[in-house]
Amino acid sequence: MTGPLSTRVATLCNQIVAEVGPDAAGQVERIGERLGEPLRVAIAGRLKAGKSTLVNALIGRRVAPTAVGECTRVVTRFRYGPADRVDVVRRDGSRRSLPLDDQGMIPQRLGVHLSRVAYVDVTLTSEKLRELTVVDTPGLASTDAGVSARAEAAVGASPVPAGTAPFDADIDADSASEVAAAEAVVYVFTQAVRADDVRALEAFRHTSARLASSPINALGVLAKADTLVGGADDPWPVAGPLAQQQGTLLARTVSDVVPVIGLLAETGEAGRLTSADADALKQLAATGNLQVLLASVDLFRGAPGPVGADRRERLLSLLDLYGIGFAIAQLSAEPRLGTGELVRRLVLASGFPRLQHTLEQTFRWRSDAIKAGWALARLDRLAGHTQDPRTREALRDAVEQLLREPDYHRLRLLDVAQRVATGAVALPADWEQELTRLATSEDARWILRLPDAGPAELADAALRAAHRWRAYAVAGAGPAQSRVAQVAHRGFYLLSQRVRG
């Protein structure tokens, strides 16, 4: 789905193709085409952090292998297509097509030496990929220097001295170009955030010219939340507060930290739990030794009971102990509960819906402005490089005319919000929070913290905020703060006009 800002820029591209020279026309067309592509989300994190499991949940199919293999050592792009297809894209641009394996997953062996692989391009018929392209990156801080190099390249990291970052210093530019187009970044970690986790996130932010690498469009995921406690115990009393602590620690790097039980999310979203699995869980629910059965993985495997060893092993692979305990509790309370409803509750218990909401509502809304700003910057850059005066003037006139439209003030708001969010410009905490709300939402009630206000009250509140920012720009700010405040002033003034109608 293309938003109104990027749609307008795409229309502009179509209009000016006929006004520019032939050399520039192809580039303008490509910029316009890129605006129509789905939101790109790059998934990054340590090896075995749960990235591929999360990718499968986002896609709605178990297609990304979770065991370490060749395909987990390269950048993999998942996008929508009319047929399932796997292409290994070499650095020279050539492709080698592969079928999915017997389990419907990417083959573990790619048939191309890893040093020659730029990325793996996977097209799937999954409906979830119609509006979302997922880019899975290799594990960061790998003990394998080659894998770490590809991970560094995937996040666009600059070379750094050995031992000072979680990457090898070698950079794969082909892989870097794949992730550079992402509108959002999801960084996956487990339990405590380590110093090099923070440095890895900083690599996204400092080496990209795109707003996607700022806290505005970066999200942390505390994966494997069920492993924070033992056995089948409820992890959420621990996972929730821990995610809040991590969010505070990473406030300059990510917009939020969301705890997720990735295995439950993958099992539910990919439709892996069958009626036979549900029947086995019902049999277990009817036994009298649940406390022993769920005390540990070994006891679950070996304790006497009506369900065979193979089925128990499968349940562990689908749900692990917490998921099994949760499912049994649901079935004990409602023995006639259907498989579909059980799956729905498992997904809710995974915490995945909150992550989906953030990606779909927050990142997707922001990505409209991100894409529009990227396209306008590319058009302006093209104007600066062309040798044809007619082309140069046509491009610059079109960009300047569009930027004068009030709707495009959002681009400037996102730009200054990024500077403040990364600490480049310091603002008082409450001012920073207000600016972030203004830059990242269209909901006037949420921006102004007036959930029950009508249009007139909202308009007056927005105007007061505009005056407050104007006064701060004139009297209470340094030069950098003043520039930010001027942008915020105009943003609130435009908001007051919009809500007043």
Q: Where is each model-derived feature located?
A:
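Globular "head" domains of long coiled-coil molecular machines
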Residues: 32, 36-294, 349
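Charge-rich, solvent-exposed alpha-helical interaction surfaces
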Residues: 8, 12-15, 27, 358, ...
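Secondary-structure edge/capping motif, primarily at the C-terminal ends of alpha-helices
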Residues: 16, 335, 362, 366, ...
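Active-site-adjacent bridging/hinge elements
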Residues: 50, 326-334, 437, 461-468
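N-terminal J-domain/J-like co-chaperone modules of DnaJ/Hsp40 proteins
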Residues: 409-501
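C-terminal end of P-loop GTPase domains and the immediately downstream helical coupling element
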Residues: 213-215, 219, 225-233, 237-411
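Charged, amphipathic alpha-helical linker segments immediately N-terminal to NTP-binding catalytic cores
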Residues: 1-22
